[in-house]
């Protein structure tokens, strides 16, 4: 599917730094570029610029893994009127609040909706 950047409702880009998913405010660089891999059955894996995987653990925490962790590293990209939501195996969405903190939520709302850019 190719390289993507994801900009939150609050203007922050998802970013992978120091083995954590964070946000950058207002701009994007190599830390904010993710490679989206199609894994069939409407599921994708999201790899960082350093070839690590975005994942959600059993406690619903978003983390970066050095290895593909099966269902923990698979997501469904839901498209909503030109925006995208990133839904994990556990039916939780990756979200970014107004302060740029990353969390997961079971509810689909504006914090869990991103602009998707092809990079």
Curated annotation (Swiss-Prot):
Phosphorylated. Sequence repeats lie at residues 34-47, 75-87. It is found in: Cytoplasm; Cell membrane. Residues 34-87 are annotated as: 2 X 13 AA approximate repeats. Transmembrane segments: none annotated. Pfam families: Fascin (PF06268). Keywords: Actin-binding, Cell membrane, Cytoplasm, Lipoprotein, Membrane, Myristate, Phosphoprotein, Repeat. CDD domains: beta-trefoil_FSCN_HatAB (cd23341). InterPro entries: Actin-crosslinking, Fascin-like_dom, Hisactophilin. PANTHER family: HISACTOPHILIN-1-RELATED, IG-LIKE DOMAIN-CONTAINING PROTEIN-RELATED. Belongs to the hisactophilin family. This is Hisactophilin-3. It comes from Dictyostelium discoideum. The gene is hatC.
């Amino acid at each position: 599917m190719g390289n993507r950047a994801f900009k939150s409702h609050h203007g922050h880009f998802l970013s992978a730094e120091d083995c954590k998913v964070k946000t950058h405010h207002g701009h994007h660089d190599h830390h904010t570029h993710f490679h989206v891999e199609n894994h069939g059955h409407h599921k994708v894996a999201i790899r960082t610029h350093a070839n690590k995987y975005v994942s959600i653990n059993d406690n619903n925490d978003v983390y970066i893994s050095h290895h593909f962790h099966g269902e923990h590293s698979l997501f469904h990209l839901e498209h909503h009127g030109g925006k995208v939501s990133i839904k994990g195996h556990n039916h939780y969405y990756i979200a970014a609040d107004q302060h740029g903190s990353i969390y997961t939520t079971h509810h689909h709302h504006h914090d869990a909706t991103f602009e998707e850019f092809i990079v």
